């Protein structure tokens, strides 16, 4: 039962807009800023306050919009669903209730305008939660990440400058449930990319987003195009025949980019992430990814899977499926939402501009259009004047050209990392780059990408995690664009030589304490792809064996230390460099290596400030 049904915004089906376009719309942006400020200012005990809506995801672990006598699962967690098959659909309806409350506030605000009131009232009816297209423009507009104050339109039509509520949320007060979570129990506002002094470092955050942009675009493309079943698409785990990140894994990256600095900020901790207003821009885009993927794979929907971690909605070990209740969200006072009807976003009165040109089209028409749309927006572009045959071939497989008449083949190269999901209690990241010159400085030229692990733990759910010690999680970083840039072939022998010469390197980033990730395994895999004439979806060529390289980047089973005070490096950074000898990985413990010598000279100083 719920005291506040989730029905979506009013006004019929309207588009959620890209934040880049949204901030340029005078009425939408004005209403959004004012409405966001209004719900942020509400008493934190109010079910429709920003605090309570955000608190559904994690802390303060209290029932949301329930009668006082409603029983809940006796489990120390929020309602959020992670690492399980309901991750996409639960968050779909979660964003909808937020959008519903936000629009309700905007409609009240629109009535206060004394000029062009009819237009403002209509704009409020059309208002939907915007999305941040992280795969296309990872560095968002200044209004989202930089400007302390923004210009909006006042009720009399004049322009005014107001505090920007998109940058952060101010707790009033800090909730008692935050006690015992260092920094989070004293920060009076949400914090992004904090430095060692616990203060935001926005220039470094922008630099980090710029550095991660190409990899994020490539991950987005592969996630949408190369996950054909629900389990592999919906959540992160270790699945057979998978070489692309899941929706959840790509989602985790954004949490890591925004929240992780020298120490963890709010977006990096699952129990606090939703309090950062950027969370809602991010999750609107995660839902958009779900819609795009649905178009590519019509008819594929929620399958059965276990609740691994436990939440306020599901006890650990519960078997979940499309009929599972998506607590605490209800269609009516007594009818909980399930995943079954959520294939159609029109039920919640929203859509995305990506579908404007194919509204009402057949599933085949929509699939073909969205496939081309994804290719254009996130795919690899051909070289200018055909100067790079390898890049042109890659574009045929992962780009905008589908009018080829040839029978095309190539190896698709990916770094694959796996680890025991619950070995570490907190969020961390694995970062990959080339270190051919022995340098520890990361640039746009040698940076490959990262895998970000998004966690939020308490003593209770940590204890449950330890009972599931063998659960494995995996992530992927793609190498094709570098190989296409530097080589004229994707041939395994040439790629093997190239990767050894480039010295493929990794490092692990976490808080400023030392840990060991014993279960980490890393390899490079080449999968033979086949693209027949006129076909737009590459497929695995089963006549050619998959190639695995364990000697260009070892399957790391030894020590991966976080915290390098012993060698004079910035705390919170660890690095491993593949040695010149095949099959040898040099970890931080190998103090005699050139890599550690370089670290001791302070080579990672700037990098530590970025990551």
UniProtKB/Swiss-Prot annotation:
<dbReference type="GO" id="GO:0004503">
    <property type="term" value="F:tyrosinase activity"/>
</dbReference>
<dbReference type="InterPro" id="IPR002227">
    <property type="entry name" value="Tyrosinase_Cu-bd"/>
</dbReference>
<feature type="binding site">
    <location>
        <position position="283"/>
    </location>
    <ligand>
        <name>Cu cation B</name>
    </ligand>
</feature>
<keyword id="KW-0479">Metal-binding</keyword>
<keyword id="KW-0503">Monooxygenase</keyword>
<protein>
    <recommendedName>
        <fullName>Polyphenol oxidase 4</fullName>
        <ecNumber>1.14.18.1</ecNumber>
    </recommendedName>
</protein>
<feature type="binding site">
    <location>
        <position position="255"/>
    </location>
    <ligand>
        <name>substrate</name>
    </ligand>
</feature>
<feature type="binding site">
    <location>
        <position position="255"/>
    </location>
    <ligand>
        <name>Cu cation B</name>
    </ligand>
</feature>
<keyword id="KW-0560">Oxidoreductase</keyword>
<dbReference type="InterPro" id="IPR041640">
    <property type="entry name" value="Tyrosinase_C"/>
</dbReference>
<feature type="cross-link" description="2'-(S-cysteinyl)-histidine (Cys-His)">
    <location>
        <begin position="80"/>
        <end position="82"/>
    </location>
</feature>
<dbReference type="InterPro" id="IPR050316">
    <property type="entry name" value="Tyrosinase/Hemocyanin"/>
</dbReference>
<feature type="binding site">
    <location>
        <position position="57"/>
    </location>
    <ligand>
        <name>Cu cation A</name>
    </ligand>
</feature>
<keyword id="KW-0186">Copper</keyword>
<keyword id="KW-0470">Melanin biosynthesis</keyword>
<dbReference type="Pfam" id="PF00264">
    <property type="entry name" value="Tyrosinase"/>
</dbReference>
<dbReference type="InterPro" id="IPR008922">
    <property type="entry name" value="Di-copper_centre_dom_sf"/>
</dbReference>
<dbReference type="GO" id="GO:0046872">
    <property type="term" value="F:metal ion binding"/>
</dbReference>
<dbReference type="Pfam" id="PF18132">
    <property type="entry name" value="Tyrosinase_C"/>
</dbReference>
<dbReference type="InterPro" id="IPR016216">
    <property type="entry name" value="Monophenol_mOase_fun"/>
</dbReference>
<feature type="propeptide" description="Removed in mature form">
    <location>
        <begin position="380"/>
        <end position="611"/>
    </location>
</feature>
<feature type="binding site">
    <location>
        <position position="91"/>
    </location>
    <ligand>
        <name>Cu cation A</name>
    </ligand>
</feature>
<feature type="binding site">
    <location>
        <position position="82"/>
    </location>
    <ligand>
        <name>Cu cation A</name>
    </ligand>
</feature>
<comment type="subunit">
    <text>Heterotetramer.</text>
</comment>
<feature type="binding site">
    <location>
        <position position="251"/>
    </location>
    <ligand>
        <name>Cu cation B</name>
    </ligand>
</feature>
<dbReference type="GO" id="GO:0042438">
    <property type="term" value="P:melanin biosynthetic process"/>
</dbReference>
<comment type="similarity">
    <text>Belongs to the tyrosinase family.</text>
</comment>
<comment type="function">
    <text>Copper-containing oxidase that catalyzes both the o-hydroxylation of monophenols and the subsequent oxidation of the resulting o-diphenols into reactive o-quinones, which evolve spontaneously to produce intermediates, which associate in dark brown pigments. Involved in the initial step of melanin synthesis. Melanins constitute a mechanism of defense and resistance to stress such as UV radiations, free radicals, gamma rays, dehydratation and extreme temperatures, and contribute to the fungal cell-wall resistance against hydrolytic enzymes in avoiding cellular lysis.</text>
</comment>
<feature type="site" description="Cleavage">
    <location>
        <begin position="379"/>
        <end position="380"/>
    </location>
</feature>
<keyword id="KW-0883">Thioether bond</keyword>
